[in-house]
Regions:
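Active-site-proximal alpha-helix that buttresses catalytic centers in soluble enzyme cores
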Residues: 2-77, 82-83, 110, 123-127, ...
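Glycine-rich phosphate-binding loop signature in dinucleotide/nucleotide-binding domains
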Residues: 43-45, 94-99
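Short phosphate-binding loop-to-helix
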Residues: 80-97
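Residues that scaffold the ATP/ADP-binding catalytic core of kinase and kinase-like folds
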Residues: 113
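Domain-level recognition of soluble alpha/beta enzyme cores
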Residues: 118-147, 151-156
Length: 177
């Protein structure tokens, strides 16, 4: 399975009058995700399903990207801020029949889970807002082992979305950039 981890876009700052759950994307965050959606299409990111954290900024991210990919969106409480690797693993294992799956959520949850999947230290990866990780999971051990294929920053994705030459081959089986 190709597993895509997309961190939510740029959101409003937290204030004493706004619950963390309710923080929405900023206009800048929405505009950036439009470009990133184009990049995902150019990279042949084509999951049928996008699972998202129920937090507003993650839901909005999923709702902006999914139509570009031709995917449907489902809420997954397991992706709420503070998710553990075991929660990620349990969630992904429910969808092992999928060729590709996208999760939209939060940091440091994504970088910690990705590091666990690829056998790296927990602080080995950092996913910026609107950044993307692709991990190819081992079909013999559904969800348990994976190989890092991409760690793309929002800047790289914006450039790809704007038509820049692809820095990676989306079908490269060796995972080399």
């Amino acid at each position: 399975m190709r597993l895509f981890l997309l961190r939510h876009g740029i959101a409003e700052p937290g204030t004493s009058h706004l619950r963390d759950f309710d923080r929405a994307l900023t206009p800048e965050g929405r505009a950036e995700l439009d470009s990133i959606g184009r990049a995902l299409r150019r990279l042949d990111v084509a999951p049928r399903l996008v699972l998202t954290s129920p937090l507003v900024r993650a839901r909005q991210t999923a709702e902006l990207v999914a139509p570009v990919l031709g995917a449907t969106v489902e809420l997954a409480d397991e992706l709420s801020s503070g998710a553990t690797f075991d929660q990620f693993l349990s969630l992904v294992r429910r969808f092992t029949a999928e060729d590709a799956l996208m999760l939209v959520g939060h940091e440091p949850d994504f970088s910690e889970a990705a590091a666990e999947w690829i056998g790296a230290n927990g602080d080995a990866l950092v996913v910026k807002k609107a950044g993307l990780i692709r991990i190819d999971l081992d079909d013999r051990h559904p969800g348990a082992h994976g190989r890092l294929r991409w760690l793309l920053t929002p800047r790289q994705l914006r450039l790809i979305g704007a038509g820049a030459e692809l820095p990676i081959d989306s079908d490269d089986e060796r995972g080399e950039a």
